[in-house]
């Protein structure tokens, strides 16, 4: 299971911990990923996706999974999310 959001493509970043004495040690910034079930109103079923907290807020802001996927770029979406987007286009 990779540490990448299935809807936005957000993944780990690298950087430094910086102490008060300005010592730098390498570290990773991991995305806040959660396993959530999102309901597709058009298809009438729910899908379990591993998405970031920011993506969950974006889905709510756009009015649900169907609206989010309609506007999302294909390059950012995972294979599973692309499959759902194609199913929505057919329906």
Swiss-Prot record:
Keywords: Ribonucleoprotein, Ribosomal protein
Gene Ontology MF annotations: structural constituent of ribosome
GO cellular component, one term: cytosolic large ribosomal subunit
Region span, Disordered: 1-23
Gene3D superfamilies: Ribosomal protein L28/L24
A GO BP annotation: translation
Pfam family, one: Ribosomal_L28
InterPro entries assigned to the protein according to its UniProt record, in alphabetical order: Ribosomal_bL28, Ribosomal_bL28/bL31-like_sf, Ribosomal_bL28_bact-type, Ribosomal_bL28_sf
Transport as UniProt keyword: no
Family the entry assigns: Belongs to the bacterial ribosomal protein bL28 family.
PANTHER family associated with the record: 39S RIBOSOMAL PROTEIN L28, MITOCHONDRIAL, LARGE RIBOSOMAL SUBUNIT PROTEIN BL28M
Descriptive protein name: Large ribosomal subunit protein bL28
Species the sequence originates in: Paracoccus denitrificans (strain Pd 1222)
Name of the gene: rpmB
